[in-house]
Amino acid sequence: MTYLAETVTLNNGEKMPLVGLGCWKMPNDVCADQIYEAIKIGYRLFDGAQDYANEKEVGQGVNRAIKEGLVKREDLVVVSKLWNSFHHPDNVPRALERTLSDLQLDYVDIFYIHFPLAFKPVPFDEKYPPGFYTGKEDEAKGHIEEEQVPLLDTWRALEKLVDQGKIKSLGISNFSGALIQDLLRGARIKPVALQIEHHPYLTQERLIKYVKNAGIQVVAYSSFGPVSFLELENKKALNTPTLFEHDTIKSIASKHKVTPQQVLLRWATQNGIAIIPKSSKKERLLDNLRINDALTLTDDELKQISGLNQNIRFNDPWEWLDNEFPTFI
């Protein structure tokens, strides 16, 4: 028996589950099986990206489930993200074709701009996904070379791919309010979603209010805060107390007889924010999927959790190598 998460209707009429499975840091050797098992449990939203280096495996899991009749393609919301190296209008369609080829799908449901940053492109056969790599000389210097491509040029190239039926919906990720405002002034096709780092240490309430008023769905990543970044040896994360052990979170969890993880996820969904937590355990996967049935936080509890905000951002391009990208300044 499968359990299907509550859905939200996006500004273009498409539906998206409020709870999905994040594919970031999902190991290649188990990724296909985890996607397949998640579909059996009831997951329908899969949040991937070119930069996660596992789109082939995501596609294998998806296509196995479709082939076996567990699900129809139109029932799934398969997400990818345009990496920074492919912002030039000539490279946008090539990058999407690479994603579709890796996924072995005819279209993606949501295609985000991963960051509002344009890197100097490198050929697929030199390095893919390229990550921070913009050439051997740059790599030797610990440097990322930028490419001078306005965001609106990238967006218009993406809009053409929507027209061609290769993308159903467009999204933006890691954008500031001012950038979103500027994009909306020139966009023909409105983004359906904004994906941001979001947890009680970084609540971004003003940005979320603006985006919601603009009719754009907010999707949270790294809902557990510093835990997501510990294995990356992120100094800020290593020096920040875990939310799982915070007295406020533990107290609320104890009151509702749930885990601290469930409190953090429900705080997001109860505020209308979609979540994409990752887990390799079937029990936890189902708990995450059924989070809205597990508990309802009081208004006071919601305020207590939001009151933990310290504006701590763990994923900040200002700290990438030597570049100091001003994405969130």
Swiss-Prot record:
<feature type="site" description="Lowers pKa of active site Tyr">
    <location>
        <position position="81"/>
    </location>
</feature>
<dbReference type="InterPro" id="IPR023210">
    <property type="entry name" value="NADP_OxRdtase_dom"/>
</dbReference>
<protein>
    <recommendedName>
        <fullName>NAD(P)H-dependent D-xylose reductase</fullName>
        <ecNumber>1.1.1.307</ecNumber>
    </recommendedName>
</protein>
<comment type="similarity">
    <text>Belongs to the aldo/keto reductase family.</text>
</comment>
<dbReference type="InterPro" id="IPR036812">
    <property type="entry name" value="NADP_OxRdtase_dom_sf"/>
</dbReference>
<feature type="binding site">
    <location>
        <begin position="173"/>
        <end position="174"/>
    </location>
    <ligand>
        <name>NAD(+)</name>
    </ligand>
</feature>
<keyword id="KW-0521">NADP</keyword>
<dbReference type="InterPro" id="IPR020471">
    <property type="entry name" value="AKR"/>
</dbReference>
<dbReference type="GO" id="GO:0042843">
    <property type="term" value="P:D-xylose catabolic process"/>
</dbReference>
<dbReference type="InterPro" id="IPR044486">
    <property type="entry name" value="AKR2B1"/>
</dbReference>
<feature type="binding site">
    <location>
        <begin position="278"/>
        <end position="288"/>
    </location>
    <ligand>
        <name>NAD(+)</name>
    </ligand>
</feature>
<keyword id="KW-0119">Carbohydrate metabolism</keyword>
<feature type="active site" description="Proton donor">
    <location>
        <position position="52"/>
    </location>
</feature>
<comment type="pathway">
    <text>Carbohydrate metabolism; D-xylose degradation.</text>
</comment>
<keyword id="KW-0859">Xylose metabolism</keyword>
<keyword id="KW-0520">NAD</keyword>
<feature type="binding site">
    <location>
        <position position="114"/>
    </location>
    <ligand>
        <name>substrate</name>
    </ligand>
</feature>
<dbReference type="GO" id="GO:0032866">
    <property type="term" value="F:D-xylose reductase (NADPH) activity"/>
</dbReference>
<feature type="binding site">
    <location>
        <begin position="222"/>
        <end position="231"/>
    </location>
    <ligand>
        <name>NAD(+)</name>
    </ligand>
</feature>
<keyword id="KW-0560">Oxidoreductase</keyword>
<dbReference type="InterPro" id="IPR018170">
    <property type="entry name" value="Aldo/ket_reductase_CS"/>
</dbReference>
<dbReference type="Pfam" id="PF00248">
    <property type="entry name" value="Aldo_ket_red"/>
</dbReference>
<comment type="function">
    <text>Reduces D-xylose into xylitol.</text>
</comment>
